[in-house]
Amino acid sequence: MESESESSSTHSSCDRFLDAEDEFFYDSFSNHYDCLNSSPPANLRRRRLPMDTDSSSSSSTSSLESCEKRSTVGENDELEVSLVDFETIEIDVDVTDSANSSIDSISEKGEDFEVIDSCTDTEKNMGENDSGRVDPFTVTTLNDERGEIYTGPEYTSTDWSLTSLVIRSIEFQVSLMITFIRFPPWLISKCLSFVFDPYRTMRRGRRYLVSWIVGLCDSGLKDDKPVLELVRRVTWGLFCAVYVGIMLFALLVSAFMISGFVITYLAHEPLVIKESLNFDYTKSSPEAYVPISSCAGVAFGLSGKESIETGKVKGLKDRTEITVSMTLPESEYNRNLGMFQVRVDFLSASGHVLASSRRPCMVKFSSEPIRLVQTLLKIAPLVTGYVSEIQTLNLKLKGLVEKDIIPTACLKIMIEQRAEFRPGAGIPEIYDASLFLESKLPFLKRIIWNWRKTLFVWISMSLFIMELLFALVFFRPLIIPRTGQRTQQRDGTHSINNNLYLDGQAGSR
């Protein structure tokens, strides 16, 4: 009778569970095993509760029955699996009672014991009646402290620093250098292939061009978004390149202007005067005048050009050097003349002599046999007119340093004869004469003037680099335009990283 009653009770329980929905069994089955596997293995450990010897018989029988019933899961269908799982849950209640008694005995003995259920949320969903149940295979965590959610570093506009800009510029230069190195061999190979087999090269080029155009058209016909995105990026890149080029050109022009003002202020041009001399042979000692500022009050018959305006030349503030060049014919008169003298006078605006410098000179001597040999050797150029029988005398005279009291207004060049000649005699025959005057600057000013172009370039480049660094530090948006796409990509990447991190934290819990 007892067996019949037990069989009838089991059949009634089976009928009762057969009427339930399939989702209940699947949910209970999945929740039961999800609770056991939810915690990460790195932070978990399993403890098996010790059982008292007094309750060994009941626990052993219940565990044997549960093992036997669980062994039949692989042989039965899904419905039998759910029934067996439910029966094991009932049997686990007895096991938990025995475990509770063992926990009480351990606590009475003073031993430390910690049981933390990691499936609290799942058991609450299953029912509040099972909240006090303790599974002997309960997973306990070593650390239950929840850390604050790490959202990752926040990217701002200042992350794109000068370091990244320098690195990118270096990468661009390296890639450009590699391209320049690889381009000549590639071009030579293509040219040689075109020379040796032009038709094949033309066919390959046409095939490549057609395939590229067809691929572009296919991608545009299938989906116009990549093409539009490419066009948008190219347009925006060209606009940014033009904008950055205009800003850099403006900085470069400003640097050149400032450098020009600095060089104009620092570099002083030396006074250089080159004038042809027209001597007045109506006087006993022929004279010629060269104006520095003005010779109006000095003489009435000026020699040479009178186009130097008053006030254009500020005077001889530095030491000067004067060179008088005279072209004389190798005539018998000049060879027999011998010595004569050239004098240069520095005159004020009123005609007073401020300083004077003299230099004796003569035609170069050569004996009669030497002149004959030279004439024989130069007979052809002399006959054709390429060479003339002339001599050029360059007379260098020391100048003076002008005082601030009386400025120099004019120069007077005079040819003086020797004392043995009567007035008007002893004057050489001259084809042409000229004067070259140059002021000698101080050492530092001379270096600045001689290196003015190099200094201009160096100052311009230094100012340009300083202006560029100043603009990048304080006015970066003025040089580098901001892009909304970059900010959106950073925000999207940041949000995706945060979501993935939060999902991982939720899964670990």
Curated annotation (Swiss-Prot):
GO cellular component, one term: endoplasmic reticulum membrane
One Pfam family cited in the UniProt record for this chain: Seipin
Domain of life: Eukaryota
InterPro entries: Seipin
Biological process terms in GO annotation: lipid droplet formation; lipid droplet organization; lipid metabolic process; pollen germination; regulation of double fertilization forming a zygote and endosperm; seed dormancy process
The protein's name in its UniProt record: Seipin-3
Family per record: Belongs to the seipin family.
Membrane association type: Multi-pass membrane protein
Localization per record: Endoplasmic reticulum membrane
Tissue occurrence: Expressed in seeds, seedlings, leaves, stems and roots. Not detected in flowers.
Domain notes: The N-terminal domain (1-230) determines the lipid droplet size.
Species in which this protein is naturally found: Arabidopsis thaliana (Mouse-ear cress)
Biased amino acid composition, Low complexity: 52-63
Ranges annotated as spanning the membrane: 238-258, 455-475
Described function: Involved in lipid metabolism and lipid droplet (LD) morphology, number, and size. Supports the formation of small-sized LDs and modulates triacylglycerol accumulation. Induces probably a reorganization of the endoplasmic reticulum into LD-forming domains.
Name of the encoding gene: SEI3
Region (Disordered): 33-73
